A protein has these predicted regions:
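Extended, well-ordered protein cores
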Residues: 1-154
Length: 154
């Protein structure tokens, strides 16, 4: 049974996930002992979770994978990302190179869906003039991609 409940803001809360993951890893809390809630309810960190945890060194590919997967709408995205971090910190630094690993395969599928959604927004979103130098457009993304996509349109 999970002893630690981590509440994050709705959407893609990469900063909240990063902070929580650092504390959990510093306290050596395995993924099976953590539940993740992306509905913004109150966090119930256990007393044994370090309040201030140092940054951990991760392969660039792991960081990039997490940044993409956190944007997916899958309710298990944070649990999957933390499982990846846990295994990398336990010595599997080249884990992302093992495409046959079930965790890696699932993460790759989530990343692919997010990147496809980003591509569709880049390719198909068209702005129309709404008068007086104002432009409007409509696109309903399948995932939480608005933040990473905004740089493209600015």
């Amino acid at each position: 049974m999970a002893r630690h409940h981590i509440a994050l803001d709705p959407g893609a809360d990469i900063a909240g996930f990063r902070d929580a993951a650092r504390r959990l890893l510093a306290s050596q809390i395995p993924p099976d002992d953590v539940t993740w809630d992306a509905q913004g309810s109150t966090s119930l960190f256990g007393e044994d979770v370090a309040a201030n945890a140092a940054a951990c060194m991760l392969p660039r590919g792991v960081v990039e994978m997490i940044q993409d997967v956190v944007c997916h709408r899958d309710s298990q995205r944070y649990a999957l990302c933390y499982a990846l971090l846990w295994r990398v910190q336990q010595g599997e630094r080249a884990l992302l190179e093992v495409a046959s690993d079930p965790l890696v395969h699932r993460l790759l599928m989530l990343r692919k869906a997010v990147r496809r959604d980003i591509h569709k927004m880049h390719a198909f979103l068209r702005f129309r003039e709404a008068g007086a130098g104002r432009f409007v457009a409509w696109y309903e993304p399948a995932h939480f991609i608005l933040e990473p996509v905004t740089r493209f349109f600015v």
